[in-house]
A protein has these predicted regions:
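C-terminal/domain-terminus segments
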Residues: 71-88, 142-155
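Helix-turn-helix/homeodomain-like alpha-helical modules used for DNA recognition
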Residues: 41-69
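Residue-level recognition of oxygen-bearing side chains
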Residues: 7-10, 66
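Solvent-exposed, amphipathic alpha-helical segments
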Residues: 22-33, 67, 122-130
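Amphipathic alpha-helical packing segments from all-alpha helical-bundle domains
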Residues: 52, 56-63, 76-103, 114-124
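C-terminal peripheral helix-coil segments that are non-catalytic and often amphipathic
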Residues: 63, 93-100, 116-162
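Alpha-helical structural segments
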Residues: 3, 10-34, 48, 52-56, ...
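Short linear capping/connector segments at secondary-structure termini
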Residues: 37-43, 71-78, 107-108
Length: 162
């Protein structure tokens, strides 16, 4: 095996790379499609984009369930150990762009890029818990929909506080 992959990390990367790259591309495609909309339209379609995007990501993950179990729980020491953090960075960047475009960010706002990062990390960690707990797809979808309502409601409260 190692003659083909070089070492254990080479084998690991050969297994998880297609899944990791595919999910990242789905996530970026959703972000870019959302941000291509006019700023005043974005808040109106936000919930739909988020729910549809989460469903698409969930189906992608569950179609490659074992790959994502490895990626999430066995990637320490590989180039994929920060995979979730990479998704968080993308979410943070695009959320910040959204808040600037829709003028939710105002001078003196308590909402900082660091706060956005922390909230994005909480969202992704909770999203991937369904994989770590080996939930079946239908149960995972129900949990993700509840989590999304939770995060969406929380953001609504934070934005009102501004």
């Amino acid at each position: 095996i190692y003659s083909r992959f070089g070492d254990k990390e080479g084998l690991f990367c050969a297994i998880v790379e297609p899944a990791a790259e595919g999910l990242t591309q789905i996530f970026l495609k959703t972000q870019e499609a959302f941000h291509a909309r006019e700023a005043e339209e974005q808040p109106k379609v936000m919930e739909t984009y988020v729910m549809d995007g989460m469903d698409e990501m969930l189906d992608y993950v569950y179609d490659r369930f074992d790959d994502f179990r490895l990626l999430l729980d066995a990637s320490y020491g590989t180039k994929y150990q920060d995979f979730v953090e990479h998704l968080v960075d993308i979410e943070t960047e695009y959320t910040y762009k959204y808040m600037e475009a829709t003028q939710f960010l105002q001078e003196g706002s308590m909402i900082t890029e660091e706060f956005l990062h922390i909230m994005s990390r909480a969202m992704f960690d909770s999203m991937f818990e369904v994989v770590r707990h080996r939930m079946d797809r239908d149960t995972a979808r129900k949990y993700l929909h509840m989590l999304e309502k939770y995060h969406y409601g929380g953001w609504g409260a934070i934005i009102k506080l501004g």
